[in-house]
C-alpha cells in the first residue's frame, strides 16, 4: 500500500530547513531571519520603484528565501521572474509575492518576539 501524501506545511517558513542551514545555531537563525525580513521589504519596494529591475531583484529574493526556508516567497519570486521574462501576468505575480513576503515577515516577527 502506498504511503499517504505528506501534509502541506502550514507555516510560511520551513524551520527544519532553517535549522539545517544554520546547523542548529538558534542565534544565527534569529540573525538571518531578521536580515531576511528587512531585505525582503527593501527588495519588494525596489521592485515597485524600479520595474525594469524587477526580474533581477526577484531572483535575489528567491535565493535568500530558499536559504531560510521561506519557500512560498521563493516560489512567488520565481513566478515574478517568469512573468517579467514573458511579459504575462506581472501584476498578479507581484501581488502574490507581496502577500507571500507579508506572511513570511509575520511568521518571522512571531519567532523573534521576546
Kindly give the residue locations of the regions a language model identified:
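C-terminal end-of-chain micro-motif
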Residues: 3, 112-114
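Intrinsically disordered or compositionally simple regulatory linkers and C-terminal tails
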Residues: 1-10
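Long, amphipathic alpha-helical coiled-coil segments characteristic
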Residues: 13-60, 67, 90-112
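C-terminal end-helix/capping segment
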Residues: 82-92
Amino acid at each position: 500500500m502506498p504511503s499517504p501524501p505528506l501534509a502541506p506545511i502550514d507555516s510560511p517558513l520551513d524551520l527544519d530547513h532553517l535549522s539545517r542551514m544554520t546547523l542548529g545555531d538558534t542565534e544565527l537563525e534569529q540573525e538571518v531571519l531578521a536580515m531576511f525580513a528587512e531585505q525582503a521589504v527593501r527588495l519588494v519596494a525596489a521592485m515597485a520603484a524600479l520595474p525594469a529591475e524587477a526580474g533581477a531583484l526577484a531572483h535575489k529574493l528567491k535565493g535568500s528565501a530558499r536559504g531560510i526556508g521561506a519557500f512560498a516567497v521563493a516560489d512567488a519570486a520565481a513566478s515574478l521572474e517568469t512573468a517579467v521574462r514573458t511579459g504575462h501576468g506581472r501584476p498578479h505575480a507581484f501581488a502574490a509575492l507581496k502577500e507571500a513576503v507579508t506572511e513570511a515577515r509575520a511568521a518571522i516577527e512571531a519567532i523573534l518576539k521576546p
